[in-house]
Curated annotation (Swiss-Prot):
The lineage of its organism: Eukaryota, Metazoa, Chordata, Craniata, Vertebrata. PROSITE patterns: TGF_BETA_1, TGF_BETA_2. It comes from the Eukaryota. Residues 1-20 form the signal peptide. The gene is INHBA. This is Inhibin beta A chain. Residues 178-197, 259-306 are annotated as: Disordered.
Length: 424
């Protein structure tokens, strides 16, 4: 069954490549290719006067992506004032002093944000009961062991308020982080006794918030800087103490119970002073405090760094990305394409030795590695296959242009520009 699946995948891949590449004898003019990189790679770049053929391939690709059979016929230029008004209403960019339109690269920024979000992990850690009254401990999951940059960190606490409260509308809630004090510190003992901690611990205020005490609800306390310091120190546990001095005036209480049983808390002599005593245990567990952490790896992190494709520099013959820019002014298309000023028609070229096949960080890698495994061992039907240099990462492109009716159109085209190349 796995072999049949691989054969089907391979045949489908070959069909796509053949379909998107021009026939060798046709000069690349048979149809607008779906993959400009494939078409450009097959053109004879070393042959004199081959540049026009590459430009023609790019032209056909752009028209194909815009669903146009031919370039629009713009008989009269649109007045600059009308163009400015249209761009302002479309919120797509601005016109520079030189008359060129600069597009706001929203789609590019979205792509960058999506890539960044893919690298970001979200971890939710529920609180455990601390070693002293009104204390909690948050153990950051081992899943976050390779995360070093905190994007956001918040502690969520539930404040329970009795229905009869009419005495105070606002209360102040403070969070203190417990920190170990170096042994032998002169003022450790007195301060620690005041807050009920062992002598080697002290505390620092990390978050404070004035909240509405007229209804029971969740409250969020930002603690990003504290978690960042914790990770920088190589630690994974956050110990905090909560304080709500005005809560007793309203009868309000913070639900703080972790895994300790209610009877154990009562055995310690806890009273209704902001600790959630006297509430049904099951409901308390549903209101259990938690830490929400969003973090990512540092760009300088040496491990699991995303492999980047090679840039062709004339010194390597291994699969790489070849830069190729087509100016719309140079090809006479700036009369109907308002922005951008040109197209980065990058393409992939180079050899794919067996030892680097399937090494890119793309979705092709898994299939390529499996097929390469069978191919190197001489298994049919993969024995005579050769790996291909293909795009592994593409980014979108925004275009602003006139149609035949001189209407201004903005279109975001996905997978338009080759960013990285790899071996299939």
């Amino acid at each position: 069954m796995p072999l049949l699946w691989l054969r089907g995948f391979l045949l489908a891949s070959c069909w796509i490549i053949v379909r998107s590449s021009p026939t060798p004898g046709s000069g690349g003019h048979s149809a607008a290719p779906d993959c400009p990189s494939c078409a450009l790679a097959t053109l004879p770049k070393d042959v004199p006067n081959s540049q026009p053929e590459m430009v023609e391939a790019v032209k056909k690709h752009i028209l194909n992506m815009l669903h146009l059979k031919k370039r629009p016929d713009v008989t009269q230029p649109v007045p600059k004032a009308a163009l400015l008004n249209a761009i302002r209403k479309l919120h797509v960019g601005k016109v520079g002093e030189n008359g060129y339109v600069e597009l706001e690269d929203d789609i590019g920024r979205r792509a960058e944000m999506n890539e960044l979000m893919e690298q970001t992990s979200e971890i939710i850690t529920f609180a455990e009961a601390g070693t002293a009254r009104k204390t909690l401990r948050f153990e950051i999951s081992k899943e976050g062991s390779d995360l070093s940059v905190v994007e956001r960190a918040e502690i969520w606490l539930f404040l329970k308020v009795p229905k009869a409260n009419r005495t105070r509308t606002k209360v102040s809630i403070r969070l203190f982080q417990q920190q170990r004090r170096p042994q032998g510190s002169a003022d450790a003992g007195e301060e620690a006794e005041d807050v009920g901690f062992p002598e080697e611990k002290s505390e620092v205020l990390i978050s404070e918030k004035v909240v509405d005490a007229r209804k029971s609800t969740w409250h969020i306390f930002p603690v990003s800087s504290s978690i960042q310091r914790l990770l920088d120190q190589g630690k994974s546990a956050l110990d905090i103490r909560t304080a709500c001095e005005q809560c007793h005036e309203t009868g309000a209480s913070l639900v703080l119970l972790g895994k300790k049983k209610k009877k154990e808390e009562e055995a310690e002599g806890r009273k209704r002073d902001g600790e959630g005593a006297g509430v049904d245990e099951e409901k308390e567990q549903s209101h259990r405090p938690f830490l929400m952490l969003q973090a990512r790896q540092s760009e300088e992190h040496p491990h699991r760094r995303r492999r980047r494709g090679l840039e062709c520099d004339g010194k390597v013959n291994i699969c790489c990305k070849k830069q190729f820019f087509v100016s719309f002014k140079d090809i006479g298309w700036n009369d109907w394409i308002i922005a951008p000023s040109g197209y980065h028609a990058n393409y992939c070229e180079g050899e794919c030795p067996s030892h680097i096949a399937g090494t890119s960080g793309s979705s092709l890698s898994f299939h390529s590695t499996v097929i390469n495994h069978y191919r190197m061992r001489g298994h049919s039907p993969f024995a005579n296959l050769k790996s291909c240099c293909v795009p592994t990462k593409l980014r979108p492109m925004s275009m602003l242009y006139y149609d035949d009716g001189q209407n201004i159109i903005k279109k975001d085209i996905q997978n338009m520009i080759v960013e990285e190349c790899g071996c299939s």
